[in-house]
Amino acid sequence: MAHNKSKIPRATLKRLPLYYRFVNTLKSKGIDRVNSKAISEALNIESATIRRDFSYFGELGKKGYGYNIDSLLEFFKTALSDSDNIHIALVGVGNLGRALLTYNFSIHDEMTITEAFDIDEQIVGTEIGDVSVHHMNDLKKVLNAQNINVVILTTPEEAAQRVANQLVEADIQGILNFTPARIEVPNTVQVHHIDLGIELQSLLFFMKNYSN
């Protein structure tokens, strides 16, 4: 199914994993079709928004029938590159880094953190959650050898930009940034910022102003 992702709103693209997870859940329950109303009620997203999101990708469903679960799953796997095993590296094995290594996408069979990096000599050479921890000096060599192009960044804030520069030199294409720093990278590298403090403040704001 041909579509130009450059013309699709970022908000739509960010909702695709939510749809995928929900449809996967329906599949595991033996459900073979779903309509936008059911998706709306489960994910708290307006039906009109769901239909508009899906319309960017062509005819995913039929009026009066809804969406076939198997067809949706096949589409989402292709759109999200989830039909392939994706190897990910993590840089910064502090408390958050250790937690992510232990979790290691346990509900996503296709995504796995396979390599970790740090500068602490007491950590380097050990394994955490079955993931080997390498020294930062070996970053580019290991990433290139393992053909890894996605990295989770959990370093201290002051080290984030320096490490980001190293990741760019290693031809990384995507960075999930858990540090408070707003790192600068070329347009060829996608960065998603996850600031837990901001997310919590946002939650508290909505609780205060929008709760019944």
From Swiss-Prot:
Tell me the keywords, alphabetical order: Cytoplasm, DNA-binding, NAD, Repressor, Transcription, Transcription regulation
Protein name as annotated: Redox-sensing transcriptional repressor Rex
Q: Where does NAD(+) bind?
A: G92, V93, G94, N95, L96, G97
The keyword ATP-binding appears for this protein: no
Q: Which GO terms describe its molecular function?
A: DNA binding; DNA-binding transcription factor activity
Identify the Gene3D superfamilies for this entry: NAD(P)-binding Rossmann-like Domain, Winged helix-like DNA-binding domain superfamily/Winged helix DNA-binding domain
Specify the domain of life of the species encoding this protein. Bacteria
SUPFAM superfamilies attached here? Answer: NAD(P)-binding Rossmann-fold domains, Winged helix' DNA-binding domain
* Species, as recorded: Staphylococcus haemolyticus (strain JCSC1435)
The answer to whether UniProt assigns keyword Zinc to this entry is: no
Q: Which GO terms describe its biological process?
A: negative regulation of DNA-templated transcription; response to redox state
| Subunit comment | Homodimer.
Instruction: Name the SMART domains for this protein.
Output: CoA_binding
Q: What does this protein do?
A: Modulates transcription in response to changes in cellular NADH/NAD(+) redox state.
The listed locations are: Cytoplasm
